[in-house]
Amino acid sequence: MPPIAFLGLGAIGAPMAKHLKNPDFDLVVWNRTPSKAAAFAAANGARHAKTPAEAARGCQIVITCLPTSREVASLLDGPDGLLAGMANGSILVDCTSGDPATSRATAARLAEKGIGFLDAPVSGGVVGAEAGKLTVMVGGDAATLERAMPALNTFGEKIVHCGPVGAGDAIKAVNQAMLAVHIWSLGEGMLALSKAGVKPEVALDVINASSGRSNVSMNLFPQRVIGRAFPRTFKLALIDKDVRIAAQFLREQNVPSPLTQLTAELFAAAHAELGEEADHVEAVKVIERTGGAEIK
Ligand code: NDP
């Protein structure tokens, strides 16, 4: 069984890593807060490492899933860093929803040591991760992806080679900007309908049989806004980061993007208002506060 390392046992990282605990791999995990790695290892029969270097030693594939590309880059250096543990010929697969420029810089640094890099952000949420049915969007060269496939297949159902390093991050950011637009526009529309006396269940019943429907209207709003549950599965802080990446990417490509830029401003303000622990769908609460009513 070849060893494989997974670093970053957060809301989505932990259920992804669980799929690597299978007969094909000898899983070793590392997490910034060591108690989480120890608990994960004990519950899943994996080993846990004290440092990124220790986790990476002897592994052909090292997977990271951290908040941003910046945290990934910060794990590379020092005596305990990934570069101290990763061998020539090994691969870093970064499942963070990262930014293309930092991923390219990280790939270049790794290439100097003969180490491959793939940006491989995922979509499908915590539910998709638990079910092993994530979509994985990969940037990097095809031969490197081929070698990483056995690992990606454990938690991914649809694995798409998107282009060179940074392409996976770019597609993920554009997808996230669309998710953010859907949340905000449906929140505004539903609040107006609610104020006009239309029941939210009735509004969603119509919208979900019509051309405005989306994952937000079909799943997120019925489960979270109507039920006022707002489970914390994907942080508002992270979608704020994603929309910023999209806004930056569109500016770099010289695409006039007023909608994406405004969405980035709205989510940055919502993040500032609701704090670090709020879930992304809770952005609707800002619309409700400024609109002076609740969607009900
Ligand atoms: P969480 O905030 O739940 O977890 C973040 C993880 O990163 C934790 O393991 C945390 O360690 C670690 N971490 C944070 N800062 C540092 C640091 N400076 N150095 C080392 N480790 C650090 O995030 P998620 O798991 O939700 O998200 C991870 C990535 O996946 C993000 O890029 C996100 O956008 C993306 N994603 C998330 C989805 C979701 O549904 N949650 C869906 C699709 C993509 P510690 O335990 O010590 O805090």
Residue map of PLM features:
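NAD(P)+-binding Rossmann beta1-loop-alpha1 motif at the extreme N-terminus of oxidoreductases
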Residues: 1-64, 90, 95-96, 126
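Active-site-proximal catalytic alpha-helix in oxidoreductases
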Residues: 131-132, 136-139, 160, 164-196, ...
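Rossmann-fold NAD(P) dinucleotide-binding segment
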Residues: 52-116
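Interdomain hinge/lid region at the active-site interface
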Residues: 178, 214-280
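NAD(P)-dependent dehydrogenase/reductase Rossmann-like domain
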Residues: 272-296
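Rossmann-fold dinucleotide-binding core
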Residues: 4, 66, 97-177
